[in-house]
């Protein structure tokens, strides 16, 4: 190995002449055989001067036989007699040749040199002979020698002859690499020419000028063997020599041929780099020229990839073709064929040949099958390694080693193309060669084998970030199973067995070490230059050594193949073997606590803080040595990474120094955090924190609001606590300037107590760093604890309190003490602490029955402040309890489906840690069992009503120790607890009703039920969320009901009369009235429901069923009966056929009960198997006679029985709770880009229309002076954030016109370039529908206008710049905007302000307050939607007058004047309107749907029949885990967005009958299961089948003196996910449906009455706003009415009872409704359920019912 290293450096010892030739480069345009004559003469002069001092002495030697080139040698051949050859680099020719010279030329007598390093050779002896020039050639050779007297001559020669014939010839350099052979052979040919052997060199045709002699052939062979060692020969040369080892002529001939080819390649590259095209020649000729060049280069092994080729072509484009540089340069995957398609398109436009396509045009689809490929598709992914500095040779291409980092070569850009064309182009592929470099087999396949490794050496790798070796015998201090992830360049993981140190002992006797990873899965042993640099060792590739920064040489570098290596002899061996590394373990007897366990135990604090705390005994029970800290440095807690993710560290040292002078508890910092949204109402939304400046002791207090009295209570509490506990007085409290601190109440309190408030200055957050950082730290801990435990978010303050307890006990690295120690308190006993969310089993000391389980699964939160117990959360009871009666659940971490903390189990560690405390608990069990106040152990902190999602598996058999359990058996029993999985509850519904995690004022073991009906019907759980309501039949035998259960322990709250009604079934979530089921009288209901507080479900005391109407207020001017008839008379209600009286059986005898089998029912923990119901409710029938969907009783019962089971938890969160609006739904893209509309548009006619529209838009932009044309700005001079990207979009309008629009990319506009406070208003859809309805009733003329390029009339205030349009060809310039270009964020607001000002000042209009874009005067009403105007007037001349005024300022186009008395068709904002003045108006979208629906790729009419309803009643959406891959998931979500987007657009325009289905499916956009997609397809199919349906309006009777505005309301109780109710409202003006709304209730209702109140309260605000709009547009009096089918709701609104409602949310709504009715002349009436057309908004209906409710207003 050492000989190889020395020999590899030996070429450096050549003379300067040799070095100069070696470094000489041949110019790309120069003859490859031409060498500078001046350089040759200079070398010859130096050689002559040196040779003139030589003398000759005879000598002889025997040449050993070469075993590699062995051939028979005649025995009679004597050895040649030649002088010694002391220097192998130079040669000398004697005056006359010896007689035996010809024998020297025998192949078996070839001399050898030390440069032949192959093991097949042996070193030459000191008498090795050098080949001599043949005597037949007249010009001798001579070589100077640096040693005098060491020349060799023939015995027959004379000094005079030698002197007269001496000439110096420079020898060729030594070949050192196969890649250098093309350059070397040039110098060798020049050597032969200088030796007067130019006649034997083959010419271009492969034949020499003259015949070569035997002596010349021998000389040729010998010199070739000396200066071209066999190991450095290319593969093709070796192949020639393997056939005939003396055929040097063939090698020369082929080399010259390759050189000529290289010259052609150089010319091709120069031509390609200097392409010029401006359209003066045919485009196909230009394409043929370029593709021929690329094909030649590809065939010669020089692959020009598509990116380089396209850039070279685009660089040469000029004239009309120049803009292709700017439109195509960003296309990363553009091909040459695609680029030429653009060139052909422009050439066609120039030549005017658009009628027919030329033959040379190719489709893009054909390009894929083209035999010519410009992309190297077989290129492997490699790492470009270039360990040399920038002034060294080019980088080598290596195989993809297993390393974690790779350096990618920079991509070619325009700058690289613009370099001198004489320089060779650097390509990014190992087949992309420099000019003159030969593409050989060695070049292509050298790195595809593992035999290119140099044994006993480490490969130097600049791309690797870590050092890796395959053998463990050099690893010191090894440790197994390191937590290190290593990937190779292909992003594949490399398994790591161990990590240790690699120690070096260099030749200067210095030692150093670096980290090393052990793995057998790599091809080479890799030595990272990055890690060497870290220990001050660098690689110098000019000297080929490793050296320090001071220049000290440490070791040589060997270049072998394409890589650089360093010998392993410098590594110090170790005694560790592979089995030792793979079997490192810890003895069980000395097993320490793993750091991940301690990290989690101590609230996820960092390792440094924990170690400080253990060293200073702030954490007791065990020492620092009891923890295994080996993984602390590299350990990454995934929960900490998620929960504590932050931007950057806070700024340190921001506090004032004088604060350190205060005594403990004299200077406090305080701050408020919050609010936390989407929590139950009793969970705290805020917390206030206090930090003592001196001790850093922290306090936290929960807050529900930030009112003055709440803050004052907390201040009073903490001041009293500090005064009594620490005998200290607070002097200063530092706080921010929030209103909660600066109010007068708190200021007086602080002044009264002598406390100085210290407020921060404005925007000085640094001065408040202590409190701010504490809140951030606590919030980080909170997120981490919740993430780790999986507990619901409403327990967030428990996590805050747990973190505060722990952090008060952890030592500060600065003070070396904890806050508790500073305050004089004892340290925290960790044996009393449990991990947050630790599963436990709590003993139930007061079970319902003696046979019931005594153990309740729970989750530990934090130690109690008020006792020695622990605060534990019980999901099944929805409680938090303070107790010591618990057992730690073994084998369970808190987050069962998440991180396993490196597969570590902490059960044994937790048992050891809490052993003493568990014994303490067990010893106190008997004493506590005799305590009379044992109930106080379950002092419930809250009645948290969670989303009733039970744990995945309930521990039905888990029993905690009973009261009689001996202390000695307590621990043993805990070990026998069932191992069934207990899952922490998921996130609760944010709108869940009351919960309280604070100690309740009145302790109660059972919750009170104020309303049996609502409680019993409000807590049912469903396994599957229903999309559609359950089905029912008209007769009682086919009806199915869900039972409601009641616990025996609550039976005392009912009267004895109720016992006769046990096991009475009630309906499920429907909760609506049905005539087929007899009504229960109010008196009978009152008998059943007693001892109840007033509730919103109370039935009316008086019965008004004789008229089915319950008026709320009797006006003084209009009679109640007349008002009722007036409101209902014109409504499009269905006509019901008369019903014959029917006898019904007693429902309490005929309907069978359905009992729950859940131990803890879904009714909030109330009830068991002995459940009974207390009240009956009614259901609607599915359909009176027939239906297309037949569902059997068994099927219906099966689906509804699942409603009694707890819902399953979901692994994948792809189901959103609700979509209240359609703003998030992506619209379908209907526009085209420039390349789609023009460049690649195959429709010639359409293309011409788009080109015409393009030029029209450009002319309009110039006409409007959109930008400043006087000055163009350089891109480098403008702030990039003020530069707005622009583009052209094209679309085809519904009237068939083609439109082009130049728009700005406002979606990427910088926020600093517009005022976010400005609003872009458009007319509300309800305002448009109201205006249209009033126009029909008042015989108005309707005129439709359009203002061309509306936005361009509005000036822009900001300084913005855009890139010029493509046709200008100025990509490097910018132009300043002067007008509001379409797409800018501020354009809409600017135009709105401009047109608003003009309409008010010039047209005499005024905007209706509260209704933007609705303008009116005494004669005309205008609805404005961007650039569309709709004018309404009874006098057409008034409209014409407005038009004339508008045309003075704006380019106004009349779309439809509306002067005809016949039917007029409009297209207004997507609505296709047919209007005959004074008769009717029809609104539809048939043409639009006919065009758009087929483009959705939905299979229409798959069964060849039309649907009669949009959905199926009784169908549930199965919400089990959605198992699809990510690509398919994204594709289906995108499809759902398109389908629901179109359906929403149509539904909210006029198809109000579809809103329930649209809203429900919109909630499942992110859950695109097969079932959801099928139901969506069914909805789209129904829209397609009914696309001709129209919303029908008829003119109101002229005798009507008033406008009647009515809202019909309905609610479907509990039929949505999380037991939310669906509410719906329909709005009618003078009997015409003008709008509708269907949505999920934002609050969880507990009864049908609450749902109905919620629905009505949602309709009132819009009803009042519409009333104001109608009165502004039409001066007639208006009557407002509300219709509902809920008698109890009407009774509540009518009632004057001021007693407290059961639920304050719905009580507030009910009281507001009372105020609305009493103050706004709002009439509320009852409507029969079968006539309630709002029913279609809340639930799926049978076909007959659906048709009956909708056929009067949409058909």
Swiss-Prot record:
<dbReference type="GO" id="GO:0075523">
    <property type="term" value="P:viral translational frameshifting"/>
</dbReference>
<feature type="domain" description="RNase H Ty1/copia-type">
    <location>
        <begin position="1610"/>
        <end position="1752"/>
    </location>
</feature>
<feature type="region of interest" description="Disordered">
    <location>
        <begin position="1130"/>
        <end position="1171"/>
    </location>
</feature>
<feature type="domain" description="Reverse transcriptase Ty1/copia-type">
    <location>
        <begin position="1338"/>
        <end position="1476"/>
    </location>
</feature>
<keyword id="KW-0963">Cytoplasm</keyword>
<keyword id="KW-0239">DNA-directed DNA polymerase</keyword>
<feature type="site" description="Cleavage; by Ty1 protease">
    <location>
        <begin position="401"/>
        <end position="402"/>
    </location>
</feature>
<feature type="binding site">
    <location>
        <position position="1428"/>
    </location>
    <ligand>
        <name>Mg(2+) 2</name>
    </ligand>
</feature>
<keyword id="KW-0694">RNA-binding</keyword>
<keyword id="KW-1188">Viral release from host cell</keyword>
<dbReference type="InterPro" id="IPR013103">
    <property type="entry name" value="RVT_2"/>
</dbReference>
<feature type="region of interest" description="RNA-binding">
    <location>
        <begin position="299"/>
        <end position="401"/>
    </location>
</feature>
<dbReference type="GO" id="GO:0003887">
    <property type="term" value="F:DNA-directed DNA polymerase activity"/>
</dbReference>
<dbReference type="GO" id="GO:0003677">
    <property type="term" value="F:DNA binding"/>
</dbReference>
<feature type="binding site">
    <location>
        <position position="1346"/>
    </location>
    <ligand>
        <name>Mg(2+) 2</name>
    </ligand>
</feature>
<keyword id="KW-0695">RNA-directed DNA polymerase</keyword>
<comment type="function">
    <text>The aspartyl protease (PR) mediates the proteolytic cleavages of the Gag and Gag-Pol polyproteins after assembly of the VLP.</text>
</comment>
<dbReference type="GO" id="GO:0005634">
    <property type="term" value="C:nucleus"/>
</dbReference>
<feature type="binding site">
    <location>
        <position position="736"/>
    </location>
    <ligand>
        <name>Mg(2+) 1</name>
    </ligand>
</feature>
<keyword id="KW-0238">DNA-binding</keyword>
<feature type="site" description="Cleavage; by Ty1 protease">
    <location>
        <begin position="582"/>
        <end position="583"/>
    </location>
</feature>
<keyword id="KW-0814">Transposable element</keyword>
<dbReference type="GO" id="GO:0008270">
    <property type="term" value="F:zinc ion binding"/>
</dbReference>
<feature type="region of interest" description="Disordered">
    <location>
        <begin position="1"/>
        <end position="93"/>
    </location>
</feature>
<keyword id="KW-0064">Aspartyl protease</keyword>
<feature type="compositionally biased region" description="Polar residues">
    <location>
        <begin position="48"/>
        <end position="60"/>
    </location>
</feature>
<keyword id="KW-0808">Transferase</keyword>
<keyword id="KW-0597">Phosphoprotein</keyword>
<dbReference type="GO" id="GO:0015074">
    <property type="term" value="P:DNA integration"/>
</dbReference>
<protein>
    <recommendedName>
        <fullName>Transposon Ty1-ER1 Gag-Pol polyprotein</fullName>
        <ecNumber>3.4.23.-</ecNumber>
        <ecNumber>2.7.7.49</ecNumber>
        <ecNumber>2.7.7.7</ecNumber>
        <ecNumber>3.1.26.4</ecNumber>
    </recommendedName>
</protein>
<feature type="compositionally biased region" description="Low complexity">
    <location>
        <begin position="402"/>
        <end position="418"/>
    </location>
</feature>
<keyword id="KW-0645">Protease</keyword>
<dbReference type="InterPro" id="IPR001584">
    <property type="entry name" value="Integrase_cat-core"/>
</dbReference>
<feature type="region of interest" description="Disordered">
    <location>
        <begin position="956"/>
        <end position="1087"/>
    </location>
</feature>
<dbReference type="GO" id="GO:0006508">
    <property type="term" value="P:proteolysis"/>
</dbReference>
<feature type="region of interest" description="Integrase-type zinc finger-like">
    <location>
        <begin position="583"/>
        <end position="640"/>
    </location>
</feature>
<feature type="compositionally biased region" description="Polar residues">
    <location>
        <begin position="1"/>
        <end position="23"/>
    </location>
</feature>
<keyword id="KW-0548">Nucleotidyltransferase</keyword>
<keyword id="KW-0511">Multifunctional enzyme</keyword>
<dbReference type="GO" id="GO:0005737">
    <property type="term" value="C:cytoplasm"/>
</dbReference>
<dbReference type="GO" id="GO:0032196">
    <property type="term" value="P:transposition"/>
</dbReference>
<feature type="short sequence motif" description="Bipartite nuclear localization signal">
    <location>
        <begin position="1178"/>
        <end position="1212"/>
    </location>
</feature>
